[in-house]
Structures are given as C-alpha cells and as structure tokens.
From Swiss-Prot:
Annotated membrane topology: Multi-pass membrane protein
Domain of life of the native organism: Bacteria
Protein name: UPF0060 membrane protein ACIAD1364
Location(s) in or outside the cell: Cell inner membrane
Ribosomal protein keyword on record: no
InterPro entries tied to this protein: UPF0060 (IPR003844)
Length: 101
C-alpha cells in the first residue's frame, strides 16, 4: 500500500510533465504522497530500518508496475535484481529485533 501511494504520487506528475495531461492530476499526486508519508509513520520501529525494508518492497512494486502498467517484459536482470532486494528486505524484516516483533 505504501509503495503504491508513492508510485502514484510520482506517476501523476510524470503524466502532467511528460504526457501533457491535465494539471488537475496534481491533486491526487499530493494526496498520494501525503498518504505515503503518513503510512511510513505508522510503524514503531526505527525510521532507518523501516526505510531500508520498504526499499525492497518499493522495488518489487515498481517492477510489477513496469510489467503490468507500462507493459514492459521484465528481463532476467530485473527478476534477479528484484529477488536479491526482496531477500535483503526479508532479512531486515524477519531479524529478531526487526520490524515484526
């Protein structure tokens, strides 16, 4: 949910600036980014650990966006890179003093 809010918050300005879409898209962009920031504050763990674990989730979500929204076939490098970062995020999340207590 957090990654989707961030991606949407960045995608709407992309549509405005690169594809000439309506400036009304700034409104959902601002709302999406505000939701993104709010969601990051909900977890009691240290902020650096949250951002590190979230990075892996964000990359996975961005790759899914690339595949299903942008309709670009993932390369083996995309898949392997996504796997590596998800494993790294899992190590951070599942450590004894990690995000899941």
């Amino acid at each position: 949910m957090t990654a989707l809010a961030e991606i949407l918050g960045c995608y709407f300005p992309y549509l405005i600036l690169k594809e000439g879409k309506t400036h009304w898209l700034w409104l959902p962009a601002i709302i999406s980014l505000a939701v993104f920031v709010w969601l990051l504050t909900l977890h009691p763990a240290a902020s650096g650990r949250i951002y590190a674990a979230y990075g892996g989730i964000y990359i996975f979500t961005a790759l899914m966006w690339l595949r299903f929204i942008d309709q670009v076939t993932l390369t083996r490098w995309d898949i392997w890179g996504g796997t590596v970062v998800l494993l790294g995020a899992a190590l951070i999340i599942l450590q004894p003093q990690g995000l899941l207590k």
